[in-house]
Amino acid sequence: MATVHSPIPALYTVYILRSTVRHASFYVGSTPNPPRRLSQHNGLVRGGAVRTSRGNLRPWEMIILVSGFPSATAALKFEWALNNPHLSMHIPSAERLVVSTQRNRNGRPRRPAKSLASVASSLHLLLRVPSFARWPLCVQFFNRDAFAAWEKWCAGVSLGERGLRESWKVVTDFGEGVTSGGSGEVAAAEGEDEAPAPWGIHALPLDYEPMKEYVAKGQEIFEFERQGRCVVCREEMKSGEGLHAVCTHEGCDGVGHISCWSRSFLKNNDTGSILPVQGQCPMCKEEVDWADMMKELTLRLRGQKEVDKLLKRKRKRATKKAKKT
């Protein structure tokens, strides 16, 4: 198994595009920077994809975004499954909603055409299958038609089927009352000096700035060796020994072994899952998201460059002094 040397990314997403010219044309991709990627697909900057380069389909709009992937590899797995729900091994054969009725020249099943209904149903199904059901994902809708298709599908799901877990985040942002250049790029109205606040993909945080205070707290605790006793098992924690995670809440300096946090979060879990989602901090009694804790932990262990940039630290550089002989 390959060794991971990078922290959990600030943002990595799987997106769904729809042509504003031909609404029956869709494209699924993944990116850490949705605004830049949309510009590439629309030919505004270099890049994009062959399938979105046809001028008679541009401009494209990002109608749905799934964020929260812990790595590019994780996002690519989800992207492939969403693009190929008729083939994906993540979906049990008996639960497939999309079935191919034709084959390509190489004999492989041909990818069925997409529609809003098929995209919404496949997305809902993937969020429920065991492979992805406990991932810390958030689904964002930037288009009313797409959200209506999602709600219609959710309303039709039978009670006997696996539903989405309660902690799933589903967000809508339709940019009411603004003039958009596509999926949230806001233009100033005539006679106005400043444009309204951005919405949609242009309002997404692309860096670690939202967790700056949390990261700073963790740095201070471990730099000054203030970790103390584990908030779960009460054992004294030694600096530099083991993996220690910090409570996400402001004002709480609760620290614990990662294994203890995990065991505490899973103690009331009756599904046999091994991946925690949420739990209560024993010190402050507030709800803590496992994904946020792991993002800070990986930044602390594997993201010194990112931490220095976030906290505006000057990195120490080794300098070589020439010796005069």
Curated annotation (Swiss-Prot):
A zinc finger (SLX1-type) spans 230-284. InterPro entries: GIY-YIG_endonuc, GIY-YIG_endonuc_sf, Slx1, SLX1_C, SLX1_endonuclease, Znf_RING/FYVE/PHD. It comes from the Eukaryota. Residues 10-92 form the GIY-YIG domain. The keyword Zinc-finger applies. Keywords: DNA damage, DNA recombination, DNA repair, Endonuclease, Hydrolase, Metal-binding, Nuclease, Nucleus, Zinc, Zinc-finger. Pfam families: GIY-YIG (PF01541), SLX1_C (PF21202). It is found in: Nucleus. One of its GO terms (cellular component) is Slx1-Slx4 complex. GO terms for molecular function: 5'-flap endonuclease activity; crossover junction DNA endonuclease activity; zinc ion binding. One of its GO terms (biological process) is double-strand break repair via homologous recombination. Its EC number is 3.1.-.-. Its cofactor is a divalent metal cation. Its main location: nucleus. Belongs to the SLX1 family. Catalytic subunit of the SLX1-SLX4 structure-specific endonuclease that resolves DNA secondary structures generated during DNA repair and recombination. Has endonuclease activity towards branched DNA substrates, introducing single-strand cuts in duplex DNA close to junctions with ss-DNA. Forms a heterodimer with SLX4. This is Structure-specific endonuclease subunit SLX1. It comes from Chaetomium globosum (strain ATCC 6205 / CBS 148.51 / DSM 1962 / NBRC 6347 / NRRL 1970).
